[in-house]
Amino acid sequence: MAIVSAEKFVQAARDNGYAVGGFNTNNLEWTQAILRAAEAKKAPVLIQTSMGAAKYMGGYKVARNLIANLVESMGITVPVAIHLDHGHYEDALECIEVGYTSIMFDGSHLPVEENLKLAKEVVEKAHAKGISVEAEVGTIGGEEDGIIGKGELAPIEDAKAMVETGIDFLAAGIGNIHGPYPVNWEGLDLDHLQKLTEALPGFPIVLHGGSGIPDEQIQAAIKLGVAKVNVNTECQIAFANATRKFARDYEANEAEYDKKKLFDPRKFLADGVKAIQASVEERIDVFGSEGKA
């Protein structure tokens, strides 16, 4: 099935009580790891680029083409959406033009009426090309490539108004944050999530900041209507830990490792890339999307 819009498989997740993963990529190796995991688990997946990651990779067109070409060259058979994560209005429009198949417009830092107005414009332009759209109400705590949110509970009326713009899935603040969770974090507000899903029956909710939330809370949120869970920090930490360990081992066995030419970046980064894949596969298991392709 390969490259697709995310609308159908996210809605299928909502209708059938599981969630799909939205995994952020940063480069070629990251993308390969996510694709290998999705193919191994036969799970639909969104490969996401933040604005900063896309810039690092050479721009939206380069990032889009990298993902699409890897899907083809690796023989990937599961549904893959190429998704913009937390995009400003101008970035959303650019991604629509260069061939992303799913867009998140994040206007949660704007006044509500402006957020709704711009979201509707993005929906009109994206849907004209068969591209799915995610938008956000109630800022998610933490920082995501320059968008800083203090974290709040998404107002129910704002959520209903956003859905009326025609978006396909909704990111809503329910006590979640980006990045590592502090020790004094109080957990997801599942009562508020239930109120949201009761007000929006059958509509897919997106859980941002999925890294670090206890599995039982994620699964409880899925039962209440979360159909997409974003993961980034968790994979970054897994990659960093595995790469650091390899570097320490290299330092302790430098002559041996040099003889084996383990300074080759393809070998030097291999453990880190494997750690990303393992992390993605484990998240797919938790979300319940294995075998749902």
Swiss-Prot record:
GO terms for molecular function: fructose-bisphosphate aldolase activity; zinc ion binding. The active site is at D85. Zn(2+) 2 binds at D106, E136. Pathway: Carbohydrate degradation; glycolysis; D-glyceraldehyde 3-phosphate and glycerone phosphate from D-glucose: step 4/4. Binds 2 Zn(2+) ions per subunit. One is catalytic and the other provides a structural contribution. One of its GO terms (biological process) is glycolytic process. Keywords: Glycolysis, Lyase, Metal-binding, Phosphoprotein, Zinc. Its cofactor is Zn(2+). Its EC number is 4.1.2.13. It catalyses: beta-D-fructose 1,6-bisphosphate = D-glyceraldehyde 3-phosphate + dihydroxyacetone phosphate. This is Fructose-bisphosphate aldolase. Pfam families: F_bP_aldolase. It is an enzyme of class 4 (lyase). Catalyzes the aldol condensation of dihydroxyacetone phosphate (DHAP or glycerone-phosphate) with glyceraldehyde 3-phosphate (G3P) to form fructose 1,6-bisphosphate (FBP) in gluconeogenesis and the reverse reaction in glycolysis. Belongs to the class II fructose-bisphosphate aldolase family. The gene is fba. D-glyceraldehyde 3-phosphate binds at S50. Zn(2+) 1 binds at H86, H178, H208. Dihydroxyacetone phosphate binds at G179, G209, G210, S211, N230, V231, N232, T233. Coiled coil: none annotated. InterPro entries: Aldolase_TIM (IPR013785), Class_II_FBP_aldolase (IPR050246), FBA_II (IPR000771), Fruc_bis_ald_class-2 (IPR011289). Phosphorylated. It comes from Streptococcus pneumoniae (strain ATCC BAA-255 / R6).
